[in-house]
Amino acid sequence: MIPGEYQIQDGDIELNAGRRTLTLCVANSGDRPIQVGSHYHFFETNDALTFDRAASRGMRLNIPAGTAVRFEPGQSREVELVELAGERRVFGFAGRVMGAL
């Protein structure tokens, strides 16, 4: 191995394999852009985002780690959410859960 060398396997990497997903239509009803990161509990996003909030409980955006989705004012788009994994306990964010899902 050479320092800094990449050793990449053939094929594709499937993110979040085997986890339940949900597609929702989300609209930004506010007057400012809203950006949501890859691991933010979608249920607790900015109230200016309108969508089926109850359905999003325990889910996050199904996008690569470290990335985000930006919603411009008045913009509406479909997003895919994926279930949170691990112990399924949520703390922080907007403080709407603060415990087990």
Swiss-Prot record:
Biological process according to GO: urea catabolic process
Protein keywords: Cytoplasm, Hydrolase
CDD domains per the UniProt record, alphabetical: Urease_beta
SUPFAM superfamilies (UniProt xref): Urease, beta-subunit (SSF51278)
Gene Ontology molecular function: urease activity
Gene Ontology cellular-component terms listed: urease complex
Pfam families: Urease_beta (PF00699)
Documented EC number(s): 3.5.1.5
Disulfide bridge positions per record: none
Enzyme kind, highest EC tier: hydrolase
Locations listed in the record: Cytoplasm
Catalytic activity annotation: urea + 2 H2O + H(+) = hydrogencarbonate + 2 NH4(+)
Keyword flag Cytoplasm: yes
InterPro entries: Urease_beta-like, Urease_betasu_sf, Urease_subunit
This protein's pathway: Nitrogen metabolism; urea degradation; CO(2) and NH(3) from urea (urease route): step 1/1
Binding partners and assembly: Heterotrimer of UreA (gamma), UreB (beta) and UreC (alpha) subunits. Three heterotrimers associate to form the active enzyme.
Sequence similarity: Belongs to the urease beta subunit family.
NCBIfam families in alphabetical order: PRK13203.1 (NF009682), urease_beta (TIGR00192)
Protein known as: Urease subunit beta
Origin species: Stutzerimonas stutzeri (strain A1501) (Pseudomonas stutzeri)
